[in-house]
Amino acid sequence: MLFFGTYDHNLDDKQRLTIPSKMRNKILNSTVYVSKGFEGSLEMRTEEEFEKWSSQILNLSSFNKETRMITREIIANTHEVEIDKIGRIKIPNNLLKLANIEKSVYILGMGDRVEIWDQKSYDNYQNDNSDRMEEIAETIYQGLNK
């Protein structure tokens, strides 16, 4: 199951987020997991993807300080959320605060997961990094062809 596209949405007054219909149709009647992401985002995964992803983290050595830190930051900031009958999820307050989300969000399909960004934060991220995209793409592409 692949998620793709960028969608502009708003939280309602009860801090619920409507999942875009193209994404929602892929995850109806299932549980999803919302976690602290990277660069100020949140990440949403299906149960199957969350189990794969979290097992990779949890299989790292707990004797390593960085492993403990990333486990604390991500796994401890993950919540199992239900999708209601009309395709909304309630994002817990602590995650909204971590991502500086108040109302307006972008929902980004990222293949195996969905990123949820505060719109201003994502716009700033894009502006700060747009000049580097070609350079990064070249570096990654060269690494794939070795």
Curated annotation (Swiss-Prot):
Keywords assigned: Cytoplasm, DNA-binding, Repeat, Transcription, Transcription regulation
GO molecular function, one term: DNA-binding transcription factor activity
GO CC, one annotated term: cytoplasm
Compartments where found: Cytoplasm, Nucleoid
Annotated protein name in UniProt: Transcriptional regulator MraZ
Protein family membership: Belongs to the MraZ family.
PANTHER family associated with the record: TRANSCRIPTIONAL REGULATOR MRAZ
SUPFAM superfamilies in UniProt: AbrB/MazE/MraZ-like (SSF89447)
Residue intervals of the SpoVT-AbrB domain: 6-49, 78-121
Gene: mraZ
Keyword presence, Transcription: yes
GO BP annotations, alphabetical order: negative regulation of DNA-templated transcription initiation
UniProt superkingdom: Bacteria
